[in-house]
Amino acid sequence: MRELRPGLWHWNAPHPQWEPTEPWDQNVSSYAIDDGERLLLFDPLSVPPEIEQLAADRETAIVLTAPWHERDTQPLVERLGFPVFTPLPESAEVLIQKYGITAEQAGDGSPDLAWLVREKKGEARLYSPGDRLPFGADVFPGREPEDTVLWIESHRAVVAGDTLVDFGEGLMIPSEWLREAVTREQVVEGLRPLLELPVEHVLATHGGPFDRAALERALSPEEPKVDPASRAT
């Protein structure tokens, strides 16, 4: 674990469901932000003991960039009772519309966070693009409505799930993860307002922290030649 700036931590952990065929690295990133009163855990996996100790003295919440990034959310909620801020998982209707599957295949909708959202085994605080969350975060649209990008004003940080990633070549919008109906240009258009903000840190949960220059390249009109050297140190 390392502290990127006062009150902002980053750590890596191996994802238990990773397969060698995945384009992303086995080690994924999680983050914690502390403002002195509230502690936020972003897409948490293998939370370090020091962060758990700090959580005992703070109003702590888990923040998921996407429902499928729950990682260690369920055991943390079961053990410590943290509320969970998350986009709403895909309903059956959304799955049918997106992927052209049958109602039978769609079932009750996405199984992501079913224990939290459908079975009510925790406190879910659902959010959508365009929302401003109570801890001062603005929600921007990602490559899907359920895959968000967050602007944390207090720490001048952008947190991204699967919309801004690093597969070993620097920060980028992953074209292989875009549905046929979604273009890179559409994603860039939704995120371009971030460039008007005083962004200093880009916290990718696949790849680690980057700087503002990496964000500018990732959101350039033309798909950029990425630069791994832009990784934050």
Per-range role (PLM):
Residues 2, 6-9, 13-16, 38-41, ...:
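Metallo-beta-lactamase
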Residues 15-27, 96-128, 145-147, 167-176:
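Active-site-proximal loop/helix segment associated with metal-binding centers of metalloenzymes
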Residues 21-24, 74, 138:
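Short linear motifs in intrinsically disordered
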Residues 26, 47-50, 69, 143, ...:
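Amphipathic coiled-coil/heptad-repeat helices and related helical stalk/stem segments
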Residues 46-131:
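Active-site HxH/HxHxD metal-binding segment of metal-dependent hydrolases
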